[in-house]
Amino acid sequence: MWMSLRRLAAVVFTSLALTGAAFAGDGVGARGPVYDITHFDVLPVTSPFDSEQIAYAALFKYRDASESDSGSESFRVVNWLLAPNHSQIIDVWRSLDAFEAHLAQSHSVEFRLAVQVQPPPPPPAFNCCIGSPIDDRQYSLVKSFNMPWTSNLLPSGVGLKNSALFVVTYIDFLADGDPGKGQDDLVRYGSDSSKVSGQLSFTVLQQLDRPNRFATLEVWDTETDYNAWQNDPKTNKFLAKVMPLLGSPLDHRLNILCGETYVDGTGCVPP
């Protein structure tokens, strides 16, 4: 489900109830951990206020508060190399109930109110800080290779020079095609990838309400290792197999890990 989080505090609890009902009737069960991937697109403007500094300060505060929520298994913010004002929030929860309880927490509501334009009143002149509404998609775990995404043993260095490479890929198989075959191909590719030098973690996810949509989370020691695998014959073979099954091209996003410091125009940097 596309869960738009453009809601005021008064709407949050009703939305959560409807969300749970929607998941209950969908084809992909919400049993087990829920992986929530949120796109965070901040306007790169400094006048009349610095949107990036306001938004990322709110984001880091939200992340730190969320890590103590019941059922939290992992909470990372990764910064897109191609456009540093774009990030992805990847949080993992023990269950759908835990995820919904997290959304109802005051720090979750306050974060969304802090960074999104709200319908007036109040405050009618407020216009900070993101370029498009926060949206997130929830996934179930299909298969994990090497270290789990939730492992604290994965690299924790931040910034361009210190971070491992965190790759998020979105895969949209044709709904009237053969998503099951596509899933099998993804899992086999994950297994092959896990044996490659520099590969630290590979996770295959399936979107809860749209079973033809998948995502992969990869962690690589270096971008050089990742690029070498992208040019490997096994990757080319995988692409040749899945291309006829796709409803849209694979969407690869290469990221670095965020810590506590963000620099306008540069992105996440060490403290």
Locations of regions flagged by a protein language model:
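An amphipathic, aromatic/His-enriched active-site/gating alpha helix that lines ligand/cofactor pockets
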Residues: K61-R76, V92-Q138, D192-L200, V219-I256
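Surface-exposed interaction/gating patches
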Residues: N152-L208
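Bacterial N-terminal signal peptides
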Residues: A9-G20
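N-terminal secretory signal peptides that target proteins for export/translocation
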Residues: M1-L5
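Short, well-ordered beta-strand segments in beta-rich or mixed alpha/beta enzyme
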Residues: P33-D41, R76-Q105, L165-D172, T203-D232, ...
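Boundary at the C-terminal end of the N-terminal hydrophobic targeting segment
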Residues: A22-A24, A30
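Short, surface-exposed ligand-recognition loops at beta-strand->loop->(often short) alpha-helix junctions
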Residues: D41-A57, D172-Q183
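Surface-exposed beta-loop interaction hotspot
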Residues: P124-F173
